[in-house]
Amino acid sequence: MAQIRQEALKKQKSETQKSTEGFVDIGNLAQWTCSSEKSGFPIRLVRDDNIDTYWQSDGSQPHTIHIKFVKRVSIKYVSMYLQYTLDESYTPSTLRISAGTGFQDLEIVTTVQVEEPTGWVHVPVGDFGRNGLLDVHLIQIKILANHQSGKDSHVRLIKIYAPEIEQPAIAVDEIPYTSLQFISRNQLR
C-alpha cells in the first residue's frame, strides 16, 4: 500500500511540474484567512506541503479562503490538492474564484466544477487577465458545494503560481572597478 501511494505521489509531482513549469509558488507572500476552521485543522495546513494534512471548514456553506498580498501580484494559476478517495463528501465539487484589490471590489473570475478529484486541480486564472496573467491583491476561493452534498470541506494544499522571474547574474569580471582599492579586492574569498 505504501509503495502504491509513493508511486502515485511521484506521478502527481511529475504532472504538476509539467503544468507549472516556468512558474513559482508565491503563496508564502500572502496572509491566509478563512471563513471557519475546525479545531486542529487550521488554514495554515494548506501551506505545509504535506498531502496528509488538511484544512477543514466548520460551519455552513459557502466556505471561503482569502489570500491577501501586500503588493499587487500577477498570477497564472490557483492550484489545489484535493483527494476524493480519502475525503469523499468533504471534497469540494464546485469552486468559485474571485479576485480584486480588496473585499470591496472582488469580481468573479471563474467557477469550476470538479468531479472526484485526486491530486492537483490547476485553475488557469491568468486566462482571465491581461497578457495571460491576473493582477490581484486579494484572491477569494469560495467552496459552493461538496461531493455527495457534504457540509464541511477538506482542502489539502493550495499554491498560487506566478511567473518565475530570472535575475541576471553579474559576473565578477563584468563589474567595472576603477579604484585601486576595489580592484585589489575583486576576488572571491
UniProtKB/Swiss-Prot annotation:
One GO BP: anaphase-promoting complex-dependent catabolic process
Protein name: Anaphase-promoting complex subunit 10
Domain named DOC: residues: 2-187
Record has Cell cycle as a keyword: yes
Pfam families: ANAPC10
GO CC, alphabetical: anaphase-promoting complex; cytosol; nucleus
Superkingdom of this protein's organism: Eukaryota
Keyword annotations from UniProtKB, A to Z: Cell cycle, Cell division, Mitosis, Ubl conjugation pathway
Protein purpose: Component of the anaphase-promoting complex/cyclosome (APC/C), a cell cycle-regulated E3 ubiquitin-protein ligase complex that controls progression through mitosis and the G1 phase of the cell cycle. The APC/C is thought to confer substrate specificity and, in the presence of ubiquitin-conjugating E2 enzymes, it catalyzes the formation of protein-ubiquitin conjugates that are subsequently degraded by the 26S proteasome. Acts as a positive regulator of the anaphase promoting complex (APC)-cyclosome. Involved in G1 cell cycle arrest in response to nitrogen starvation.
Organism this protein belongs to: Schizosaccharomyces pombe (strain 972 / ATCC 24843) (Fission yeast)
CDD domains noted in UniProt: APC10
InterPro entries: APC10/Doc1, APC_su10/DOC_dom, Galactose-bd-like_sf
Signal peptide: none
Ligase listed as a keyword: no
